[in-house]
C-alpha cells in the first residue's frame, strides 16, 4: 500500500477544523467486518481516525504500508502485462511494477485545494483561512467570521465555531438541502442491550442501507413531495416566519446533489 502523506487516515488525519465529523452514519460508512461500537453514529473526526488505525493494527496491515510514497505516474505495459509506477519518496524517484493496481486516492488534492479569488482579496486585513489547512494555532474566540459556502464543510464548521466566536455568518451563492437527524441511533442503542455487538451492527447497517436506498428512490420518483417534506421539517426547526424559500430552498431536486446532514439540529 502506497500512502503519499506522512500518516494514515486521509481526510480524518488531515482535517483539523472545529467540528470535523462524518456526514454519513458510521454503520454504513464503516467496514462490514469491524463493528462501529460508539454511541454516536454521526461521528467526530478523531473517533473515525482511531477506528481506522485500530482496523490497520488489528489486521496487521501497517507493515505493508509505505508512508510518504506518492504515485507520480502509472502506465500499463502491454508487452510485459504489468503496471509500471513512478513513485516519489522524499526527493527520490522509485520505479515499481505490479500486476493489479487499485487507485484509492480520492478526487481532490491534499496539498493544493481550490482557493477561490474575489475582488479586493489582497486588501482584506483579517485572516483568510482554508479549512483544509486549519491548525491549533488559529484563535477565533470572540472574532467576527464569515464562512463562504454552504456545503458539507460549512454545515459542519459553522455550529462549532459559533460556540466561541463573536458573530458567524454563512455566505452562500445558492442553498443546499439540509436534513437534521439524531447523532445517536435509538434502535442501535436498544438492540445492543440484548444482542451481540456483531449482530446488532449487521442489523443496523442493513436497516440504514435499505432506508437510505428507499428515501433516495422516493426522492427520484416524487421529487416535489420530498422537497416539500424537507422544507416543512426546516420550518418546524426555524419557525414558519423564517424565510425558508430564500435561505434553504435549492434550485435543484432532492438528491440531484448530496444532501447536507445536520446532527441533532446543531446548525439551527
Language model region names:
Residues 30-37, 211-213, 248-252:
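Short glycine/proline-rich turn/loop motifs
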Residues 1-65, 172-173, 237-242:
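Beta1-alpha1 glycine-rich phosphate/pyrophosphate-binding loop at the start
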Residues 19-32, 225-249, 260-266:
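Flavin (FAD/FMN) cofactor-binding and adjacent substrate-gating region
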Residues 40-109, 230, 237:
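Feature captures the FAD/FMN-dependent oxidoreductase FAD-binding
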Residues 13-24, 115-122, 137-138, 267-268:
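FAD-binding beta-loop-beta segment adjacent to the flavin cofactor pocket
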Residues 1-7, 104-243:
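Rossmann-like dinucleotide-binding core of oxidoreductases
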Residues 36-54, 66, 148, 218-228, ...:
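Short beta-strand to alpha-helix junction loop
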Amino acid at each position: 500500500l502506497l500512502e503519499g502523506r506522512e500518516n494514515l487516515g486521509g481526510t480524518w488525519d488531515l482535517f483539523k477544523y472545529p467540528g470535523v465529523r462524518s456526514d454519513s452514519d458510521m454503520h454504513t460508512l464503516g467496514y462490514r467486518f469491524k463493528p462501529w461500537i460508539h454511541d454516536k453514529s454521526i461521528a467526530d473526526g478523531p473517533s473515525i481516525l482511531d477506528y481506522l488505525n485500530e482496523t490497520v493494527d488489528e489486521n496487521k496491515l501497517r507493515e505493508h504500508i509505505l508512508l510518504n510514497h506518492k504515485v507520480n505516474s502509472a502506465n500499463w505495459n502491454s508487452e510485459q502485462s504489468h503496471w509500471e509506477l513512478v513513485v516519489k519518496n522524499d526527493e527520490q524517484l522509485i520505479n515499481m511494477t505490479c500486476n493489479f493496481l487499485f487507485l484509492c486516492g480520492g478526487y481532490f488534492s491534499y496539498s493544493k485545494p481550490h482557493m477561490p479569488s474575489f475582488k479586493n482579496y489582497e486588501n482584506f486585513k483579517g485572516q483568510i483561512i482554508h479549512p483544509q489547512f486549519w491548525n491549533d494555532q488559529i484563535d477565533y474566540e470572540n472574532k467576527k467570521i464569515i464562512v463562504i459556502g454552504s456545503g458539507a464543510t460549512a454545515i459542519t464548521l459553522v455550529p462549532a465555531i459559533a460556540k466561541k466566536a463573536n458573530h458567524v455568518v454563512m455566505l452562500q451563492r445558492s442553498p443546499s438541502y439540509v436534513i437534521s437527524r439524531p447523532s445517536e441511533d435509538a434502535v442501535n442503542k436498544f438492540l445492543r442491550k440484548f444482542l451481540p455487538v456483531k449482530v446488532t451492527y449487521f442489523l443496523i447497517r442493513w436497516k440504514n442501507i435499505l432506508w437510505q436506498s428507499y428515501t433516495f428512490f422516493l426522492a427520484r420518483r416524487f421529487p416535489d413531495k420530498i422537497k416539500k417534506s424537507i422544507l416543512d421539517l426546516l420550518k418546524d426547526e426555524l419557525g414558519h416566519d423564517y424565510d425558508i424559500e430564500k435561505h434553504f430552498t435549492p434550485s435543484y431536486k432532492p438528491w440531484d446533489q448530496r444532501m447536507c446532514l445536520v446532527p441533532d439540529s446543531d446548525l439551527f
